[in-house]
Amino acid sequence: MAVPKKRTSMSKKHIRRNLWKKKGSLAAVKAFSLAQSISTGQSKSFFVAQKKVLEKS
């Protein structure tokens, strides 16, 4: 099994963690933006099937 020879520096650890967090926050912003456009009906890339409501006589 591969074992690292030296300890990873704290600055490198922080840089990697910040990149990981930034990637997650960008994905969250993108998902929220898509949800907003779908809910307002302004989405051009998503088609939401509308259900027809049948009235009973």
Curated annotation (Swiss-Prot):
Keyword Ribonucleoprotein: yes
Principal location class: plastid
GO MF annotation list: structural constituent of ribosome
Keyword Amino-acid biosynthesis recorded: no
UniProt entry keywords in alphabetical sequence: Chloroplast, Plastid, Ribonucleoprotein, Ribosomal protein
Residue intervals passing through the bilayer: none
UniProt-listed GO biological process terms: translation
Localization per Swiss-Prot or TrEMBL: Plastid, Chloroplast
InterPro entries: Ribosomal_bL32 (IPR002677), Ribosomal_bL32_plant/cyanobact (IPR044958), Ribosomal_zn-bd (IPR011332)
CC annotations in GO: chloroplast; large ribosomal subunit
Similarity-based family: Belongs to the bacterial ribosomal protein bL32 family.
The protein's name in its UniProt record: Large ribosomal subunit protein bL32c
Biological source species: Phalaenopsis aphrodite subsp. formosana (Moth orchid)
Name of the gene: rpl32
